[in-house]
Amino acid sequence: MKDVKDFTTYLKVEKNYSNYTIKNYQLDIESFLDDCKENNIDYLKITYQEARSYVNRLYNEKHEKATSVSRKISSIRSFYRYLANNKKENYSFHLLKLPKKGKRLPKYLEYNEIDEIFDIPNLEEPLGIRNSLILEMLYATGMRVGELVSIKVNDINMNTKTIKILGKGNKERIVYFNKITAKRLKLYLKEARGKLNTKKSDYLFLNKLGGRLTPRGVEYVLDEIMKHTAITKHLTPHMLRHS
């Protein structure tokens, strides 16, 4: 669709967003446009009530989390702002506010903020490679920081792309990871972990002294990463899980 193509070109040329960020915007918008088509809605003439009904469908029919819904709305608003500026028309989606769901919405990162954070770790250094994997695993798998630092190398199955996790109440569960996570994991195991593992630890994530990385150590890593960004939010493992 021309409007979507023009918008993604704008994000690349004018906003200088990465391909990863642009793809996420595109997926959100295309999902919304598919919904419009299924419900016989002209996206250029969508009413405020129709926009609200779309949000309700995300919650009640697709059972999406509040953070996922919030970011989709943010992506679609950006799309309509672009259309408004270029077509000189007003669209009802501008007026849409996220319905309150009882609990306060967890804090999360926008796509461009995630992109900025992932650019910080230096992949030429063992600690930078490790930090990149920490970001990726918290973001892509949604595991808790306590679960992250408890992973042992033998808990990982690269063939099935799964990790055996010991969660709350010492209950074992399986977490799946994607190709991007697998690539970062392979890089860490091949290029970085051996250089950090001076104490012959079984744990996946190690500190600079060769010992097991702690939850506080992960928080310190995130704090240091944020010092090199223009983002004003306080980054926590919990925030990455909800992004």
Regions found by a protein language model. Give the residues of each.
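Conserved catalytic core of the tyrosine transesterase superfamily
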Residues: 1-243
